[in-house]
Regions:
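Structured, active/binding-site neighborhoods that engage oxygen-rich ligands
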Residues: 1-213
Length: 213
């Protein structure tokens, strides 16, 4: 059963809160551990977005050398409609192949000029170097130029993946889906305070769209 199917089979209760997800492994990353953080309304495609986030979280861990996705994981990802395609897998393969050259130039990467998938790769490279806090420094560069950044699913998935692999996902992380399809990261204190210079704020996430085109 694919990741998306597993997630789709996870029922929600009457309040729209996702019940505990089966312990599906993405590489060595547990979807259950990633997704028990989610609080979702009942009218959103939770399974699709969840599978998408899980992929990028696992991808970040793979690039950082923390985990390695299995052949079954790759097969599931390529079969999941609109979550990713072979072009992205090929591009990721090139990134992993040339990881050393990318890492060597990471300090000068113009992150804002990269598309969301490329930003995820760049942040994963930061996170794989030296200390767990390096990926946070990379993201802070985006904040310096864009005080109200819109986080895409791959970008947030990467951040969660590196955070999960090296420090653990904060228990205060809560996500809810708005009627317009955007996602708000609400009061994720351990993360948001670092991102916003100590202030509790809401970060808007754009979960889908153009990066797959």
């Amino acid at each position: 059963m694919t990741i998306a199917n597993q997630l789709a089979s996870s029922a929600k209760n009457d309040n729209g809160i996702m019940r505990r997800i089966p312990d599906v492994m993405v590489g060595h990353v547990s979807c259950r551990e990633l997704m028990t953080c989610l609080e979702a309304s009942t009218d959103q495609p939770v399974a699709v977005i969840s599978a998408e986030w899980s992929f990028y979280a696992a991808l970040s861990l793979s690039i950082a050398g923390i985990s390695k996705p299995t052949a079954q994981d790759y097969a599931s990802w390529t079969q999941t409609k609109d979550v990713l395609n072979h072009e992205i897998l090929d591009w990721v393969g090139q990134c992993v192949k040339h990881r050393k050259s990318l890492a060597a130039t990471r300090d000068s990467l113009p992150l804002l000029s990269l598309n969301p998938v490329e930003q995820s790769i760049a942040l994963a490279l930061y996170g794989s170097q030296s200390t767990p806090g390096n990926w946070m420094l990379a993201f802070s560069r985006i904040l310096q130029v864009s005080p109200q950044p819109k986080l895409t699913a791959p970008l947030l998935g990467c951040l969660l993946g590196v955070q999960f692999g090296q420090q653990g996902i904060p228990s205060s992380l809560r996500v809810h889906y708005q009627a317009d399809g955007k996602i708000c990261l609400v009061k994720a204190r351990r993360l948001v305070k670092l991102w916003s210079g100590g202030q509790d704020e809401t970060l808007v996430v754009s979960p889908r769209r153009s990066y797959l085109n």
